[in-house]
Amino acid sequence: MKRTVIVGALLAVGAVGAMLRAQQPPPSPEASARQADLILSNGKIITVDERFTIAQAVAIRGDRIVAVGTNQEIARLAGASTRRVDLMGKAVIPGLIDNHMHLLRAGTTWVKELRFDGVESRKKAIELIQARAKALGPGEWVFNIGGWAHQQFADDPKPFTRDELDQIAPNNPVALQESYYQVFLNSRGLKAFGIEENVPDPTDFVKGSIMRDAAGKPTGIIKGDIAATRPVAARLPKVEANELEASSAALVADMNRAGLTSFGVAGCNADVLEIFQKWKAQGHLNVRTFCIGGAAASTPEQADRSIQQIAQMKLFQGDDYIDNVFFGESVYQPLHDPMFALKSNPRPDQLEQWRRMAMAIAKAGLPLHVHAELHDTIDAFLDQIEAVNKEHSIRNLRWTLAHVNQINAPQLERMKKLGMYAAVHPWAVINGGIMHEGFGDGAYDMPALATIQASGIMWGFGTDATAANQYLPFTTLAFAVTGKMPGGLKVIKQTISREDALIAHTRKNAFLVFHEDDLGAIQPGKLADLLVLDRDYLTIPADQIKDIKPTMTMVGGRIVYDSINAAQPKIVRIPSERR
């Protein structure tokens, strides 16, 4: 990646300075109209524009960037009321965009969960379990719903056992869901679910998913992909209605702390979306939410009804904070391939229903964002899409295959010819060890990031968090550059440059959520979503990328996370100024 540098030597990395009020003579009316509300200077501004320009300073007016350049150039935009941040050499990047996360669903459990995202030590995980049990008191559930796998524990990468969890939290039921692969329970957790020795398995669990030893005693493991883990998650406590807003606020705060500012959201939970709408009206919604939803079907009869609904479906009725942008992620539910299946076997009758619905989506002129994981599923869907395209062109609809962990070069070429895009969600970030157990050396190309990048297709990063995967974007970026899971296990060989990885998490994702004119780069006219980092993404050793922390997160010119005042994020209210 060629970088264009427009500044000289930069200052050494240090703490973000306090905002300093500019001391200049009163500006003329003409100058006041041009002056910035906020200037960040003395930094390394990694713009992620088309030339990957590096600048020193950025000026913001209202919710948008008005100028990027040298310290001297940007200083000319300061006025008497301009606020300043001295970056003291720190790196700044655009706010990170996740193109596919189940964000709103997570709000229904977030404050109840014990998250292991980014935890690289089993010792640390045990300490977290013990601390949560102590804080909650006896009898309360200690649980999480995915986002981790035991192979990320560098000190002791093995599964939890029933006896071990009994010792760690003897007075609490425990359920630790490992991605969508398996769940570890202690004795109290098993009893709470009615799973006991010499007692038939509960009927809502998938047959054979409850592991037992030779004597018939439950081992504490529920195993067998999403269908097997779903009954556990369904029985775990969700927040009460009067707690939902606080849980959603904690979720958004954690996303901002991680450096995430915008999302393609699969399945926009109506109750949480209503809260987001309220926050937007009040002027303090701190993430941008671009919904992926629609009338998916499970039977031919439902497909008939869905086709009628598709004809009436309208997208792009929102704004740059909340909007509906895609039909998806499922079209015909029986073709939803599980993430840990070794092979998919799409049936002709199922593909016929999928094609009928896809034809209706194309006829209605709607964008499509569809789950497609395994090689066979991707081929089958491309066959159907090519047939649809002969009757209704999809070239300008930004149809996107999502997940695509087994995609290959011929499939990418077929997608390019159709004008399609790829939303890449590398499950190997946490599931690499599990995938190698199932796919052997083939897992080293899951996903084939170098092949995807070399294909020239438009693509971007997402996670499919918070159950299937972890949500931390710098963990994803580190994985893309090093091929390593948290904990250091090398699980893929096809890596990409740190510049290409960052572009895929910013500028290209802005395109995938239909906001390329507003998001994804630090450029004049774009929304002021940006991060100040505690270290330089471009120069630190690759193995340290996962450890990068934002010291400040900004959304639309408002500071929504500030590590210096992390307990009470500094909200700077700046009136919106539209172009």
Each language-model region and where it sits:
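Glycine- and charge-enriched low-complexity intrinsically disordered segments
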Residues: 562-576
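Bacterial N-terminal signal peptides that target proteins for export
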Residues: 1-9
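Accessory "access/gating" subregions that flank catalytic or transport cores
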Residues: 315-317
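Boundary at the C-terminal end of the N-terminal hydrophobic targeting segment
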Residues: 20-22
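Ligand-binding beta-strand-loop-alpha-helix segment within the catalytic cores
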Residues: 421
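Bacterial N-terminal signal peptides
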Residues: 8-17
